[in-house]
Amino acid sequence: MTAYDAIVIGAGPSGTVAASYLRDRGHRVVIIEKQLFPRFVIGESLLPLSMGHWEETGLLPALMVQKYAVKRGARFIRGKEVLDLAFADNFTEGWTWTWQVPRAHFDHVLAKATEAKGIPIHYGHEVTGVELDHPDGVRVTARDADGEKEFTARFLIDSSGYGGVLVKLLGLKDRGAGNGRMAMFTHVTETDAFRSTVKDPMQISFEIVDTDLWFWVIPFSNEVTSLGFVGHQRHFDALERSPSTSAAFSTMLARQQGFGPRFATPQYLWEPKVIREYAHYNDSLHGRNYVLTGNCAGFLDPVFSSGVAFATNSGLMAAKLLHASWNGIPVDWEKDYSVPVKRGAAVFKSYIEAWYNGDLHKIFFAPDLQQNIKEQIVSVLAGYVWDEKNPFVARHDSILRTLANVVDMSAASPKIAQVPNTQ
């Protein structure tokens, strides 16, 4: 039995980034993955923040040759109003573009690039037991079709996503947000010939259907488009009235206005999926000889596409701290890991809540939105939620409400309202 420096559970974006960083620095790493790749997973819209993570871990070259659809920003639609936000208008220095991707293919490319570094990935292995006080550090038991295997290492990184391996095995407190939100989504076929008849066919777009209901359109470069509705569960009564989820989805499609007849007769590739009460978080992100990264640490919301960005950021952060600790540098996992991860999540949560209560809609579609404000907001939406020089990060818990109030005042009395100082 090989003794490793680190065992990583999960071969998604968080696990592959963490494993690659450690392997590049000479550490022995193994990945245990429950599923066989390629496999479907949601989270198809990426953020520029992650591009730097893939660059730093040497995974970017494998992605660059795939010809994924380039995402340079996002379009927001409210009735007849349209707002295009470009990542190039970014307050924080960093990447100004990314991709929108079919995750089954994308994650498989990442996994193969990780394996090419000499990191073994054991697919089809379900973790059934964890011992955190083993003489070697940790011992993990995993089972596949041929039986059980044991792995030992100095440290365990749980990047198992929604599977939440350690949450289940250790009985960790995983809390649901309880906000009543749900998502229904699917993939449809759109041939290049059909797309040639559509205006801006590759533009990733988000339409506000109601204050707390929105519709996503994410076109891929493989003639497939991801469609989804997200919002409070009261908007999904079509599920109760329809003979199938595809019929319910078609009923929901009739509510969108921003795409005309484009989705009048959708060619579903599979029956739409439904996820209820998807938001969750863990009280503790680390413990003796282990750390949680990615979605198993918590997930906020599909809006603004923060999932993969937090996955790669937390995976890289954990790997860097682990490498530092193995080189004699003291690491306080609470102060150095949990606090910054939760701080970034809190910033994004402010924007998510401002989206669902309508404040951000007001700001987005306000007439004559100042360029500096737009750049600072775009920086957050690009994933740079740790840039405290950005007032829309540093004052995230109050500045959006204040600005929305200013927009309301301006609409009522343009001569009175003043935009808050964001310098």
Language model region names:
Residues M1-G12, V30:
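Beta1/beta-strand and adjacent pyrophosphate-binding region of the FAD-binding site
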Residues G15-T16:
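N-terminal Rossmann-fold NAD(P) dinucleotide-binding loop
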Residues R23-I42:
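Glycine-rich FAD pyrophosphate-binding loop
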Residues F40-K80:
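N-terminal FAD cofactor-binding segment of flavoenzymes
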Residues F91-K112, D237-S244:
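Short beta-strand to alpha-helix junction loop
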Residues A113-F259:
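Predominantly flavin-linked oxidoreductase catalytic cores and closely associated redox partners
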Residues Q233, D237-L321, N327-E334, S338:
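FAD/FMN-dependent oxidoreductases across multiple families
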Residues K320-Q423:
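C-terminal helical "tail/cap" subdomain of flavin- and related membrane-associated enzymes
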